[in-house]
Structures are given as C-alpha cells and as structure tokens.
From Swiss-Prot:
Its main location: cytoplasm. Allosterically activated by GTP. Inhibited by UTP. It comes from Parasynechococcus marenigrum (strain WH8102). Keywords: Allosteric enzyme, ATP-binding, Cytoplasm, Kinase, Nucleotide-binding, Pyrimidine biosynthesis, Transferase. This is Uridylate kinase. Catalyzes the reversible phosphorylation of UMP to UDP. It is an enzyme of class 2 (transferase). It is found in: Cytoplasm. GO terms for molecular function: ATP binding; UMP kinase activity. GO terms for cellular component: cytoplasm. UMP binds at G51, D71, C132, G133, N134, P135, F136, F137, T138, T139. Pathway: Pyrimidine metabolism; CTP biosynthesis via de novo pathway; UDP from UMP (UMPK route): step 1/1. Its EC number is 2.7.4.22.
C-alpha cells in the first residue's frame, strides 16, 4: 500500500539530535531531504511538530507553573520549530507553509482547514504549529486531530526508536518489538506510543499509525511506500 496523504508527527526532542537542547541543523536538513524525495514522488505531506526540545508544558507545570500557562509556552516553542522546519524544507526545494492554531500573521498563516488542504493538493508541505491552540492537549493529539481534519490516510510517528516495544528497549535488553498492534492493545496495555486521547481519535476515525525510527535515512519514504518498517497500529486484521 502506498499512502497518498500523510500526517507526519515529529517530536521536538527529535530535532535536537544528540544535543541536550535546541535544534540540530543537520537533523533538520536530513528530514528535509527525506521529505523532498517523498513530495517529489507525489505524496501529499503535512507535519505536526512538538516543542519539547525548547519547552515542555508538563515539566513547567511540575515546576510550579500553572498548567495552562505552561502549555501555552510549549505551543510557542512548537512555532519556533515549525518555522525552522519550513526554512530547511524550502532550502531543499519544497514549497512549505506554516499554519498556527494561535494567530501570528507576521510569521505564519492561521490554521484554516480548507486552505491547508488546498496547499496539499498543490504539492506544498504544510507544517502545523502551536498545537491545537488549547492547553491540556498534546501535540500527539493535535496530530490525530489534524489527520482527521485533512483526511490523511495515515499518521506517521517518527521517533528515536524503531517501533513499539513491550517495555523500554533502552533499559531492557529483552524488550520485544511489536510489528502490529490494535488501538485497543495500545490503550489497554498503556504502551508509551501516544497519549490515550490521540489513540482514541485515530481509532474513532480509522486512521492507522506507523511508528518508526526517524534517524534511519529513507525511512519516511519506506513508510510512505507501505514497506514493513517499525510498528503499525490499526484495527484487527
């Protein structure tokens, strides 16, 4: 199966590479190169990016900030990442638009669903920033929401690991990777893939999720082509 319209979820942490903070330009360039090849092949691609490389709302809340305030700061961090991604993509020859859920007309378009879909149809990449514009919702949930809104075929969750494991592979040498999971497997097993709201949204709208390693060059293209990489979450076969 080749996917024609994809929602790619990138974590903020992925953008910082091996650094402890911020954005690694080499990672941005690598992502842009992979995305350019996918778009050149005719796939329509939208991106939701997190902000954890700059600020995490939950961490701010744990440190004493009001949760809603901390989440708004996190949303602004995602816009910094979105604009950086736009720059990298356009340098790679990919026409890109940033749309934000909080109006910032000097640097981005406001999120307008129909306009986003027209951009995709014209071969442009759309990067969604500022989460969904509301506190208490993660960028994973935003990815599921935007995927449903733009009628995406699939959500790609590109991470630092090559799939979903039964336990943390960084801590357990005997961790087993799941090739296929149902939405209910993830929800009932409380597997650390996406938060339960994001999984439930994908389940309700029958949007499959593919989890794979972002740092393996060409993996975005392999996932688009439907190659069996990473872990796939969906309805029972």
């Amino acid at each position: 199966m080749t996917y024609s319209r994809v929602l790619l979820k990138l974590s903020g942490e992925a953008l910082m590479g091996t650094q402890g903070y911020g954005i690694d330009p080499a990672i941005v360039n690598s992502i842009a190169s992979d995305v350019a090849k996918v778009v050149a092949g005719g796939t329509e691609l939208a991106i939701v990016v997190g902000g954890g490389n700059i600020f995490r709302g939950l961490k701010g809340s744990a440190a004493g900030m009001e949760r809603a305030t901390a989440d708004y700061v996190g949303m602004l961090a995602t816009v910094m990442n979105a604009i950086t991604l736009q720059d990298g993509l356009e340098r790679a020859g990919v026409p890109t638009r940033v749309q934000t859920a909080i109006a910032m007309q000097e640097v981005a378009e406001p999120y307008i669903r129909r306009k986003a879909m027209r951009h995709l149809e014209k071969g442009r990449v759309v990067v969604f920033g500022a989460g969904c514009g509301n506190p208490f919702f993660t960028t994973d949930t935003t990815a599921a929401l935007r995927a449903a809104e733009i009628n995406a075929d699939v959500v790609f969750k590109a991470t630092k690991v090559d799939g979903v494991y039964d336990k943390d592979p960084a801590k357990h040498a005997d961790a087993v990777k799941h090739a296929h999971l149902t939405y209910q497997d993830v929800l009932s097993g409380e597997l650390a893939v996406m938060d339960s709201t994001a999984i439930a949204l994908c389940k309700d709208n029958n949007i499959p999720i593919v989890v794979f390693n972002l740092f393996e060059p060409g993996n975005i293209g392999r996932a688009v082509a439907g190659e069996p990489i990473g872990s796939r979450i969906g309805n029972p076969a």
